[in-house]
A protein has these predicted regions:
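Signature of the first transmembrane helix
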Residues: 10-75, 104-108, 173-174, 233-263
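Helix-loop junctions and terminal segments of transmembrane helices
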Residues: 63-79, 155, 214-215, 275-313
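Residue-level recognition of pore/gate-forming positions within transmembrane alpha-helices
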Residues: 22, 26, 53-56, 91, ...
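Alpha-helical transmembrane segments of polytopic membrane transporters and translocases
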Residues: 46-62, 91-94, 194, 201, ...
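Interhelical loop/hinge segments that connect adjacent transmembrane helices in multipass membrane
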Residues: 1-11, 188-192, 206-250, 288, ...
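Hydrophobic alpha-helical transmembrane segments
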Residues: 21, 134, 163-213, 233-234, ...
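Interfacial transmembrane-helix starts/ends
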Residues: 11-12, 49, 83-98, 232, ...
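Short membrane-interface helical motifs at transmembrane helix boundaries
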Residues: 104-124
Length: 313
């Protein structure tokens, strides 16, 4: 069997696994939103979407860097240079640590002030809103930590593991939604704390799986200035697209909160769930085929790389 035929079968299998994951998560997330809205109420659900959306604005930096990390890990994997692969992975983790420190400083210095002076929060819910801010920040850091591991998983085309872990995370989120229906504590704080716990457990699973299966996923404190500069240079182009999209989505969310209140945020939060689910249809196929394109190019199989680009368009 030719390499092209094997690659085509792998892409088809990976695409199928990603679509199974997507369909499951789409159904679960839409139902979870309904249960969470019922448990929190319109105002608290709106507060959650507005405050957590404020933290999501900082992901414009991490999103562009994540694309660079994924590209570099996949490219070096295609070259077959194991030593450089570990260097890329370790450099990626150092970059994520630096971003995490920067975001924490910005949120604690600016975010807390903005929340308590400019955002529209119902009377008596400022304490809960501040808890949401801090726990959403912690969840954001957990997600940053897992980015190089996720990139390695996709670069090695282990889409079945990626799908199963995603299904676990979606199921856990649904479990959290049912738990808060009978919460003895402040429902909003309890919900965000449990979501933070789910994020932590999921990231630990990603880390353990990658360390056991991929030799490059062992962190070593190495700093390659040239590689660091190259990764940030590549990320700069992704940053242009990321910042425009995220400012449009999350900036509107904050403006809605300031001028119309949390009830409008609740409605927009539900609409965003549907919009995100639909957008993932094309994204999943691209996720399945991108590693093959990058690895073919890295190994100087330019014709195969061009062929994959044309056939996947």
């Amino acid at each position: 069997m030719s390499d092209t035929s094997v690659n085509n079968k792998r892409i088809a299998k990976n695409t199928l696994m990603l679509y199974v994951r997507m369909l499951f998560l789409m159904a679960v997330n839409l139902y979870t939103s309904r249960v969470v809205l019922q448990a929190l109420g319109v105002e608290d659900y709106g507060v959650y979407n507005a405050v957590a959306g404020f933290i999501a604005m900082f992901s414009m930096v991490s999103a562009s860097i994540s694309g660079a990390i994924s590209r570099f890990i996949t490219f070096v994997l295609g070259q077959g240079d194991q030593q450089k692969l570990n260097k890329v992975f370790s450099t990626a983790l150092i970059i994520q640590i630096a971003i995490a420190i920067l975001v924490v400083v910005l949120v604690e210095a600016f975010g807390v002030w903005f929340l308590n002076t400019h955002m529209t929060i119902p009377e008596g819910r400022y304490v809960a809103a501040n808890w949401v801010l801090q726990l959403a920040l912690l969840t954001f850091i957990f997600n940053l930590w897992s980015t190089p591991y996720n990139a390695s998983l996709i670069a090695h085309e282990r889409m079945s593991a990626f799908a199963y872990i995603g299904i676990f995370e979606g199921s856990a989120n649904l479990g959290v939604a049912f738990l808060i229906l009978a919460s003895p504590f402040d429902t909003l704080i309890y919900y965000v704390a449990l979501m933070c716990l789910v994020a932590l457990v999921t990231r630990i699973i990603y880390t353990v799986y990658c360390k056991r299966n991929f030799s490059e996923c062992i962190f070593r404190w190495v700093f390659d200035r040239a590689l660091f500069k190259e990764m940030f240079g590549f990320a700069g182009w992704n940053f242009v697209g990321s910042i425009s999209g995220l400012l449009r989505e999350q900036g509107i969310n904050i403006l809605f909160n300031v001028y119309f209140g949390p009830a409008v945020n609740a409605a927009r939060g539900l609409a965003a769930q549907v919009h995100t689910a639909v957008g993932k249809f094309s994204q999943n196929f691209f996720t399945a085929v991108q590693p093959q394109i990058t690895k073919s190019y890295a190994s100087n199989n330019i014709d195969d790389s061009h062929s994959l680009v044309l056939r996947s368009s």
